[in-house]
Amino acid sequence: MIPVVKAKLLEGKKGLIVGIANENSIAWGCAKAFRAFGAELAVTYLNDKAKKYVEPLARELEAAILMPLDVRTPGQMEAVFERIAKDWGKLDFVVHSIAFSPRDALQGRVVDVSREGFLTTMEVSCWTFIRMAHLAEPLMRKGGTLFTMTYYGS
């Protein structure tokens, strides 16, 4: 269990954390900090293989929602936001901490990357943030905050 600090600055706030893979994930550090200040969290995991690593962390966070989210699978992003709407009716913040690039796009010179590799990288690493913002907007009736991470390789 994550200890909650006495000054619960985020008490009553509800947030979605996307990108926890294990205890070394930047998203995990963000989630611990948000929880420590009293936020209630929804956490996603990539697939069944990742679930075995993320589920114990979600328990430690006392996450109210734990759902699969492969952003390249049609309907999964929508399902996450539908569940948040059903359970909470609102959303105060989203942490988008995911990125992906095909192996061949990570090797060699950037000018040699294939169109397909580049588009896959942009879809997962960038466009999904925009899509999540679109899906979050109706739940952020009083405003909200969107966080995304970058990497020095970008």
Name each region found by the language model.
Residues 16, 42, 67, 94, ...:
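Conserved Rossmann-like nucleotide-binding pocket used by diverse enzymes
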Residues 7-43:
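Canonical Rossmann dinucleotide-binding motif of NAD(H)/NADP(H)-dependent dehydrogenases/reductases
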Residues 39-53:
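Conserved glycine-rich Rossmann-like NAD(P)H-binding loop of the short-chain dehydrogenase/reductase
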Residues 58-59, 67-78, 82-119:
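Conserved mid-core segment of classical short-chain dehydrogenase/reductases
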